[in-house]
A protein has these predicted regions:
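Nuclease-adjacent, charged terminal/linker segments that flank catalytic cores
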Residues: 1-101
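Non-catalytic regulatory appendages
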Residues: 67-70, 84-133
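Acidic, glycine-rich flexible loop segments
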Residues: 149-152, 161
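Mg2+/Mn2+-dependent nuclease catalytic core
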Residues: 176-197
Length: 200
């Protein structure tokens, strides 16, 4: 296993192993650990790229109750929305992204979107994530998501640890005894290693 790893021996309390590890990490001083899996990073992406997702592209919406565009998971999705996508990346580059995400988090709360699981996306985790995850790392993650929203929207690590200072954060994939990394989980871990993003 080429990925950084830590082995913990915990008393079994019948809780899911991910929650046991989260509780253990939250008993350590500094920072806070959250169970996020595939909810936080795709959720932040969707809030920032909302105008691109819901752009009035021909043929994307043909039913009033559609929660997302018909071509969201097609390889030409980004190509048809270049202007809106570039505007979102510009917000990351000029520092306005955090306010954009905060505003949309409030404005769009509860509106059905295929990339957002509102029940898992708390104001607390969004605020803490925006405070510590560097814009350049968010940009790298969002570009990776955009390359293949369908497949890259899964396989993200179970837990996120958010520290007290900018740049202090880590993604943690939890495996119980006999559990193995899936291919799509390995792809994300390899990507994080390449980008210098702490993950284990």
């Amino acid at each position: 296993n080429a990925y950084p790893s830590l082995q913990l021996t915990l008393a079994d309390n019948d809780d899911h192993v991910e929650y046991q590890v989260m509780d253990y990490l939250n008993q350590q001083p500094g920072g806070q650990c959250f169970y996020v899996e595939n909810t936080l990073l795709p959720g932040l992406f969707a809030l920032l790229f909302w105008p691109a997702i819901y752009a009035p592209v021909s043929g994307a919406f043909f039913h009033p109750f559609q929660s997302g565009p018909a071509d969201l998971f097609r390889d030409y999705f980004a190509r048809l929305r270049e202007e809106e996508i570039n505007a979102a990346f510009l917000a990351l580059q000029n520092g306005s992204y955090a306010d954009v995400i905060r505003t949309r988090f409030t404005q769009k709360q509860g509106i059905s979107c295929p990339l957002i699981h509102w029940g898992w996306l708390s104001a607390d985790v969004v605020e803490k994530a925006l405070a510590v995850i560097p814009a350049a790392q968010l940009e790298a993650i969002f570009r990776h998501l955009l390359r293949d929203l369908k497949n890259h929207g899964r396989g993200l690590p179970d837990l996120i640890w958010l520290g007290d200072k900018p740049g202090e954060w880590k993604l943690i994939e939890v495996k119980g005894p006999g559990d193995r990394l899936q291919d799509h989980q390995k792809l994300w871990l390899e990507f994080f290693l390449q980008q210098g993003i702490a993950a284990e």
